[in-house]
Curated annotation (Swiss-Prot):
[4Fe-4S] cluster binds at C123, C320, C482. Its cofactor is [4Fe-4S] cluster. Residues 13-33 have a biased composition (Polar residues). Binds 1 [4Fe-4S] cluster per subunit. The cluster is coordinated with 3 cysteines and an exchangeable S-adenosyl-L-methionine. It is an enzyme of class 2 (transferase). Pfam families: Diphthamide_syn. This is 2-(3-amino-3-carboxypropyl)histidine synthase subunit 1.
């Protein structure tokens, strides 16, 4: 079900079998134990949901395809008896900030404050500033609950702002472009039968030439069940989580497209005779002309995965946090959202899986590429420059593994005096700064031999001009605000700007990443070749190193509960894994309810007998 401002999702509203809302009551007259009923303490009252004035205000002020959850917001403000409410949202939603403020002040007794500072993500929730302004409640729009509500300084309500899109067009776009057979997908979409290592077989040069085939014959061939289903991983921003779940269900069932363009989910109808594009020989089709592309409809089911990296929602990715996928299982990543910032995160974490982006606003579907080798080289160079400022360490240019120099440092005191200091930047924009990360970084620098002098610096936003004011006194900087600042903009700074992970690599707390390796970015061309002494070609690019963390890939796990080390804010917060064969909490709850249901039916059966 699509949700919008006129028809908000009533996830906490109880309904009767006929669809009418009603109060839920528990019958306590019976002494027979039965399944417990869920509490609905946060249910939005009917007088708010059905308020004609409120609904008219929402309809006239806010866009219908954006769900700002106004009813729930009004309910929570009234319930908390809030007197001053702070509204915080990213710049893309600021257009409606004044309208939301007017609605809140009209239908509650609270005043509002619009927080105009830049909001890059969920890490920027600014409850401390809101409290300093005298607000007793904060409504944060557009991001997930990265900072739990029980850890904020004042009462905080997160509104994801789910955006309604065209689900039929989204599913049809996938089926019209992606064969559901893995071999056909790799041949037609990736340009050959490409392995996870980046090697491919040659593509038939005659694939682009069209041949007339009879529709009945083509349908017989296309109707054959695939040997292996195309495996897609669906991800996106939090605004499109519902769209991701809907797409998953649509791709897990058969959908047929008739000659007139109509899409049905029933059994495949009898195809009319039609002209289709094919090859001049009996070889399988490798490329399809644009005119006949819509006829390459894949009506079968796909294998679909919606990955999750906790504490994020299933399918959700952040610019700094994305799941690590199995490159031998996943054939493609499908990202739903506009822009590349969040998509690049999962591309960096999974460089050997091709990525495609569906823009729900323009309805364009494109393949996105990323220069992994260049990024890794630049970040490796930044680590080496930082190491050179203190000496005693070097970085292997091929594997980026930190190792000791051959020259042994004898006079550690001299090195300690001549070594340049490092600046450790703690972000103060919202909740970006983490004292836990600062303590971990400071301890790593102090434990280094020789110890690296460092000074903590508090900054809300970084810029080359701001850090340039420190002159030559600091040789390198470590910033804990966002890893993407170092990855995307590190080259713009005069001194190395390391992320916490890169700092850990530089002081030998963890082995690093490989800079140039086979298969990065699923390149369509074979790996680079070089001539050996005998004139024979040999691979100049090494294979991935299984002995390195994440097989030598660059991690994107900054807010993951299962991150690599203590240089991330939530390291070690993942719950302990259950023993093999142990039941999950959900399974135990279902088992308990089943036992209660059986116990409640036993006396009735005995009385009847």
């Amino acid at each position: 079900m699509q949700s919008n401002a006129e028809n908000p999702r009533k996830r906490f509203t109880a309904t009767s079998p006929n669809g009418n809302r009603q109060n839920v009551s528990v019958d306590t007259s019976s002494n027979v134990a039965g399944p417990s009923r869920p509490r609905i303490a946060n249910a939005v009252p009917a007088e708010i949901l059905d308020d004609p004035a409120l609904n008219q205000a929402i309809k006239s002020i806010l866009p219908s395809n954006y769900n700002f959850e106004i009813h729930k917001t009004i309910h929570h403000i009234r319930k908390a008896s809030a007197s001053c409410v702070a509204l915080q949202m990213p710049e893309g939603l600021t257009l409606w900030a004044t309208g939301i403020a007017d609605i809140v002040e009209r239908f509650t007794d609270a005043t509002t404050v619009i927080m105009g500072d830049v909001t890059y993500g969920a890490c920027c929730v600014d409850d401390y500033t809101a409290m300093a302004l005298g607000c007793d409640m904060l409504v944060h729009y557009g991001h997930s609950c990265l900072v739990p509500v029980d850890q904020t300084a004042i009462k905080t309500l997160y509104v994801f702002v789910e955006i309604s899109i065209d689900p039929a067009h989204l599913a049809a776009t996938i089926r019209a472009n992606f064969p559901n057979d893995r071999h056909d997908f790799r041949a037609k979409i990736l340009g050959g039968s490409q392995s996870a290592a980046g090697k491919r077989s040659e593509v038939d040069e005659s694939a682009g030439r069209a041949q007339i085939q009879i529709g009945e014959q083509a349908s017989v061939a296309s109707g054959a069940p695939p040997s292996t289903l195309t495996h897609l991983a669906l991800v996106g921003t939090v605004q499109f989580i519902n769209a991701i779940n809907g797409l998953r269900e649509a791709l897990r069932q058969q959908q047929h497209r008739l000659a007139d363009g109509q899409i049905v989910s029933t059994e495949s109808p009898v195809d009319r005779l039609m002209l289709t594009a094919g090859t001049a020989s009996s070889a399988p089709v490798q490329h399809i002309t644009q005119a006949a592309k819509w006829k390459a409809w894949s009506s079968g089911e796909y294998k679909v995965t919606v990955p999750q990296v906790k504490p994020l929602s299933p399918g959700e990715v952040l610019g700094c946090t994305s799941p690590k996928l199995d490159k031998d299982e996943i054939d493609a990543i499908v990202y739903i959202g506009d822009g590349r910032f969040h998509l690049e995160s999962i591309m960096i974490a999974n460089p050997r899986i091709p990525a495609f982006r569906y823009d729900p606003y323009t309805k364009r579907f494109v393949r996105e590429l990323y220069d992994h080798a260049e990024m890794r080289r630049m970040r490796g160079e930044a680590v080496r420059l930082a190491q050179d400022s203190v000496g005693g360490l070097d970085l292997d240019p091929e594997t980026s593994i930190v190792k000791k120099n051959k020259a042994v440092v004898v006079d550690a005191e001299k090195d300690r005096v001549t070594a340049s200091g490092w600046g450790v930047l703690l972000g103060t924009l919202g909740r970006q700064g983490s004292l836990r990360v600062l303590e971990s970084l400071s301890a790593s620098l102090s434990e280094h031999v020789p110890p690296i002098p460092h000074v903590p610096i508090l900054l809300s936003e970084l810029s080359p001009q701001k850090l340039g004011l420190f002159g030559e006194h600091l040789a390198a900087f470590i910033q804990s605000s966002c890893p993407r600042l170092s990855i995307d903009w590190g080259s713009a700074f005069a001194k190395p700007l390391l992320s916490p992970y890169e700092a850990a690599v530089s002081v030998k707390k963890v082995k690093g990443w490989q800079e140039d390796v086979q298969g990065l970015g699923m390149s369509r061309t074979p790996a680079k070749q070089q001539q050996d002494g005998n004139g024979n070609g040999s691979d100049a690019v090494p294979a991935e190193d299984k002995h390195l963390p994440l097989d030598g890939d660059y991690p994107m796990d900054f807010y993951s509960d299962t991150s690599l080390g203590p240089w991330t804010p939530r390291h070690g917060m993942a719950p302990a894994k259950k023993p093999v064969g142990a039941k999950s909490n959900l399974a135990l709850l279902r088992s308990l309810r089943s036992k209660r249901a059986k116990a409640s039916s036993t006396p009735t059966s005995a009385a009847t007998a």
